[in-house]
């Protein structure tokens, strides 16, 4: 059975809660205990977990943004069965719907100026450009196309390969 706990804030708040002032005690940090300090009445935090998955937006527009903090958290939260596994939506969750048409052949190579993201303008850009906006209206085919497009985009960013055949070749 899977249970989801929503932390309800951003990655930099997590950093401050878990790591700030605890740099010398990183081997003994108890994530669930830190979460209980914020939300002591939530019974899910008393459960035992086989895996902990942390999903946050990158949020470079936050005034607490720091590449060093991101690197520290990625290093620390690197295994779901130990300290937890951190996944970061880049630049934020809204990126999944940044399709100007559907399907959108340019999606894989679409870039946004990082300075605009840091200024908090990305959501506005997606709001103006996105062809798909309401997640509750998505069909299975639309979800599949979004997933395939994002796999292709990740493959293009990391390996400069544009097709799924290339992805399969990497893993064979």
Which residues fall in each region the model found?
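N-terminal carbohydrate-binding/catalytic regions of secreted carbohydrate-active enzymes
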Residues: 28
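A surface-exposed, charged beta-strand/loop segment in the N-terminal or early-internal portion
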Residues: 31
């Amino acid at each position: 059975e899977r249970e989801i706990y929503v932390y309800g804030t951003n990655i930099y708040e997590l950093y401050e809660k878990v790591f700030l002032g605890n740099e010398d005690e990183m081997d003994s940090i108890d994530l669930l205990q830190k979460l209980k300090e914020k939300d002591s009445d939530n019974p899910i935090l008393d459960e035992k977990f086989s895996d902990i998955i942390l999903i946050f937006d990158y949020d470079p527009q936050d005034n607490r943004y720091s590449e060093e903090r991101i690197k520290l958290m990625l290093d620390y939260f690197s295994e779901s069965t130990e300290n937890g596994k951190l996944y970061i939506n880049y630049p934020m969750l809204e990126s999944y719907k940044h399709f100007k048409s559907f399907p959108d052949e340019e999606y894989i190579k679409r870039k946004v100026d990082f300075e605009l993201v840091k200024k908090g303008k990305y959501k506005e850009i997606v709001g103006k450009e996105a062809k798909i906006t309401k997640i509750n209206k998505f069909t299975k085919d639309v979800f599949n196309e979004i997933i395939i497009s994002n796999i292709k985009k990740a493959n293009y960013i990391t390996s400069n390969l544009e097709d799924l055949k290339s992805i399969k070749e990497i893993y064979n």
